[in-house]
């Protein structure tokens, strides 16, 4: 078997389905599939993720002309900030309206740095809504890290880049909010080797004993998979919700824009978010996309930055040919070309890229 048949099994945990793909070293997607969850709104939906993975392994098809792939590793990403207890009890990222930390004049300065944390409000919400489970669980995981733990027994939290700490938490701020510091697994870096699949999981899934590589947030996997990691690149991640993401070399903050670090040191990502995009009427949806692009374009002009002429799209909406054509035609009127990258599910490509990078630079489980 040729070395080119070596693959990473990339896994992305979505809101309603699990996606899987076989990704080669050069980023080629040999095959991919999607497995819907039987009850995506069930409070214990996370318990079904490993069963969806098993179904994906059985379902994923390899073209007859190709040799059987040699799976070298699994790479896992998923939606966030979904939270899961060890029992599988799940607080999904989109269940409740976005909430902010309650800060006042008595709040210590170190906590104020976390005013825009993505995870802390959800952790506090979990504690308040499901207090018994919060107390009983040894660990509280982000979504993809729960599956990593199931597969390897290793409890981790993926911190995409050191500057992301204020979007997550640190020991001091957890203590300040009365959250046991040991309940949130320790941070590991993007591409961390969580260790091999356990023997039981190898047998259950029908997979070889290979390492599980931590990718973490699907947001990060999507940016990597679309190449939105260089200044002046932009992508449109459009599934059940939508985010237009612009990579820049300046930290720019503005109303209506979420500013987060890029995984590339020194760069930043500006996001305009459209919650529940897929459920909006098409005309309303497209006008929100146009407004988001115009906002980012204005910020670029105000800060002396060139705005790109091409946007790479990914996600479920990219698979709807009629909608994609309508959106592309509208953006052409703005002088912008809308394209699809290697595949419509760029998160899988990003997972593969992270895993292959980790395999080229081996690191023992930490």
Residue ranges and their predicted role:
Residues 53-60, 219, 285-308, 354, ...:
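Phosphate/ATP-binding catalytic cores across multiple sugar-kinase/actin-like superfamilies
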Residues 82-105, 137, 141-171, 210-284:
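Glycine-rich phosphate-binding loop of actin/hexokinase-like ATP-binding domains
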Residues 17, 189-197, 307-330:
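Glycine-rich phosphate-binding loops at beta-strand->alpha-helix junctions
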Residues 13-15, 110-217:
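Gly/Ser/Thr-rich active-site cleft segment
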Residues 218-225, 274-275, 287, 318-319, ...:
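Glycine-rich phosphate-binding/hydrolytic loop that grips phosphoryl groups
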Residues 73-74, 139-141, 182-190, 211-214, ...:
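Beta-strand segments within the central parallel beta-sheet cores of soluble alpha/beta enzyme folds
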Residues 1-87, 91, 136, 202-214, ...:
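N-terminal glycine/serine-rich phosphate-binding loop of ATP-dependent small-molecule kinases
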């Amino acid at each position: 078997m040729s070395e080119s048949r070596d693959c990473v099994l990339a896994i992305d945990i979505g809101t309603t389905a699990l996606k899987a793909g076989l990704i080669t070293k050069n980023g080629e997607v040999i095959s991919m599939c999607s497995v819907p969850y039987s009850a995506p709104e069930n409070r214990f939906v996370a318990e079904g993720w490993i069963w969806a993975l098993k179904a994906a392994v059985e379902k994923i098809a390899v073209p007859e002309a190709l040799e059987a792939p040699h799976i070298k590793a699994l790479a896992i990403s998923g939606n966030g900030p979904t939270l899961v207890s060890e029992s599988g009890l799940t607080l999904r990222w989109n269940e409740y309206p976005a909430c902010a930390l309650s800060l006042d004049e008595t709040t210590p300065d170190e906590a104020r740095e976390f005013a825009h944390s993505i995870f802390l409000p959800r952790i506090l919400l979990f504690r308040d809504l499901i207090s018994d489970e919060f107390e009983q669980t040894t660990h509280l995981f982000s979504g993809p890290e729960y599956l990593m733990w199931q597969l390897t027994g290793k409890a981790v939290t993926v911190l995409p880049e050191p500057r992301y700490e204020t979007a997550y938490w640190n020991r001091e701020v957890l203590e300040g909010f009365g959250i046991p510091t040991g309940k949130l697994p320790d941070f590991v870096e993007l591409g961390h080797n969580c260790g091999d699949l356990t023997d039981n999981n190898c047998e259950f899934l029908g997979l070889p004993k290979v390492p599980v590589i931590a990718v973490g947030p699907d947001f990060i996997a999507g940016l990597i998979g679309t190449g939105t990691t260089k200044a002046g690149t932009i992508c449109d991640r459009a599934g059940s919700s939508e985010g237009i993401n612009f990579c820049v070399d300046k930290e720019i903050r503005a109303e209506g824009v979420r500013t987060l670090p890029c995984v590339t040191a020194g760069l930043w990502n500006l996001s305009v978010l459209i919650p529940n995009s897929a459920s909006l009427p098409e005309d309303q949806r497209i006008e929100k996309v146009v407004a988001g692009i115009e906002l980012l374009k204005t910020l670029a002009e105000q800060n002396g930055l060139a705005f790109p002429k091409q946007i790479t799209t990914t996600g479920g909406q990219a698979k709807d040919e009629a909608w994609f054509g309508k959106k592309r035609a509208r953006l052409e009127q703005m002088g912008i070309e809308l394209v699809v990258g290697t595949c419509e599910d760029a998160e899988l490509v990003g997972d593969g890229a992270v895993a292959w990078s980790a395999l080229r630079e081996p690191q023992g489980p930490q």
